[in-house]
């Protein structure tokens, strides 16, 4: 979000480098100017911080503000909304990629499953949990495969087993709810 439309000559120069995309170059709340910019350059724009819901996604695509969408489940309200955005983008031939937000292994399990959907055709912002956590709250270690992928967990539920000792160790507050 560091640029404005006054930087159009810079963006046109960037076109010469055949970049895969330029992510969120303008203000997060300005899909109108993103649409103007996208019409002027060859490089695909990817909206990230502008996307908080399916409604934002629809508006951005209909206005021509981008050709790629970054989906971050934590930003859009969870996996149900993420799946709706994925499906809508697929119906409009707009590729998506997954952005992570430093989730624990529980969130990472959901993110890896989400990123395995068919319209996530760009490399996703997912990494091994050891990159950020010396000890995670799941037993499963997410590792990069030699081809750069991460295997989708296949266990029951979200596919991973919670490390109850680690969860207890890192819990800062408990609340009991009576039926």
Named regions from a protein language model:
Residues 12, 21, 29-46, 51-149:
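Shared catalytic-loop signature of beta/alpha-barrel
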Residues 7-10:
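Metal-coordinating catalytic core of metallo-dependent amide/deamination hydrolases
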Residues 137-179:
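C-terminal extensions of enzymes
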């Amino acid at each position: 979000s560091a640029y404005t439309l006054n930087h159009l000559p810079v963006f046109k120069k960037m076109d010469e480098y055949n970049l895969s995309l330029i992510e969120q170059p303008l203000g997060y709340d300005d899909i109108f100017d993103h649409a103007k910019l996208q019409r002027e350059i060859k490089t695909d724009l990817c909206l990230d911080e502008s996307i908080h819901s399916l409604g934002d996604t629809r508006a951005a695509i209909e206005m021509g503000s981008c050709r790629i969408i970054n989906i971050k489940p934590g930003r859009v309200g969870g996996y149900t909304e993420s799946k709706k955005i994925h499906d809508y983008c697929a119906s409009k031939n707009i590729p998506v990629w997954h952005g992570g937000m430093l989730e624990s292994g529980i969130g990472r399990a959901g993110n890896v499953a989400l990123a395995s959907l068919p319209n996530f055709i760009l490399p996703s912002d997912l990494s091994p949990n050891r990159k950020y956590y010396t000890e995670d709250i799941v037993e499963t270690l997410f590792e990069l495969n030699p081809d750069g992928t991460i295997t989708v967990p296949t266990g029951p539920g979200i596919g991973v087993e919670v490390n109850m000792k680690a969860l207890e160790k890192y819990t800062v507050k408990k609340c009991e709810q009576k039926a």
